[in-house]
């Protein structure tokens, strides 16, 4: 008789998304995978070829928005009926060491007998002093229970070491992108030039600095005027209306298109049509850019990148793109003028790109699961 596939349950709270989970599609011949998805999930899952299971949460009964998120946090976030969904699992794969859903799994681990794997993006070692009291309790439940932690970057690994996680329980395992899908996409850079600022429309993603850089280019601040340059701001989020008003205030409203998040399969063509990706991430008191999947997607597409030097961005981008100080829209405009708008289109190092491939990411995850259950 053929050996049954070990069951793996994926937990991402309200943040299940295609770019994180898609590489795991490759493991379905070997493992029985499913992702639990709440009714309040923040991302579209179009095109994800993994089984998903709808699970209730207290937030589902609240209106959308940050206020609802704060209310749900105060009430206590949780999956409803999680125990039954995890019963019989060989591996539960959650994320981060201070999240409600990882803590909920950790508290069920001994009773249900599964192994607990965590993907960790966090690059700031909060320890206990800088965590909210509830997150301290989450951390205290999670760290003793976690069998293996998959740090997405070296910076995340180093943060875990400062959290006193033993080094032998940490594996650096970057996420993966379907490189061939992006490299093979049709399309050429547009004329007039098009800048792409993609990501959730929140302050810390720095779309406002991308708009400032565009305005500087149009007005000739720091060099010859470039009124021909346009911008596509791609994403959804609470800053959408404010960013539209700001583009108009800066005098570039007619040169900026705002488009909601598109299905993931449409992204390769957008990269290929862009003159440059602009990633203006801004560190906050509680966050810095933890990876930047758009960087790898742009590299795979051959699209130049100008990005803020924040968090793990330098580690991921390497020598491929130009880095500017976070918030320095003038330097961003100068870098765009000197590089992508001057016709430069760099080639990514194939060895670097291969490390970020979906196939490599899937292989690393397979090895992680097998190391715990074989």
Q: Where are each of the predicted segments found?
A:
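Conserved acidic donor-binding segment of nucleotide-sugar-dependent glycosyltransferases
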Residues: 105, 309, 319-329, 336-343
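Conserved donor-binding/catalytic core segment of Leloir-type glycosyltransferases
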Residues: 9, 186-216, 232, 277
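Acidic donor-binding loop of glycosyltransferase active sites
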Residues: 272-287, 303
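Short alpha-helical donor nucleotide-sugar binding micro-motif in glycosyltransferases
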Residues: 86, 143, 261-262, 269-274
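A short, histidine- and acid-enriched strand-loop-helix "catalytic/donor-clamping" loop
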Residues: 15-16, 100, 114-133, 145-148
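Nucleotide-activated donor-binding/catalytic signature segment of Leloir-type glycosyltransferases, i.e.
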Residues: 241-262
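Carbohydrate-associated surface elements
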Residues: 155, 176
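Short hydrophobic beta-strand element within catalytic cores of glycosyltransferases
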Residues: 295-307
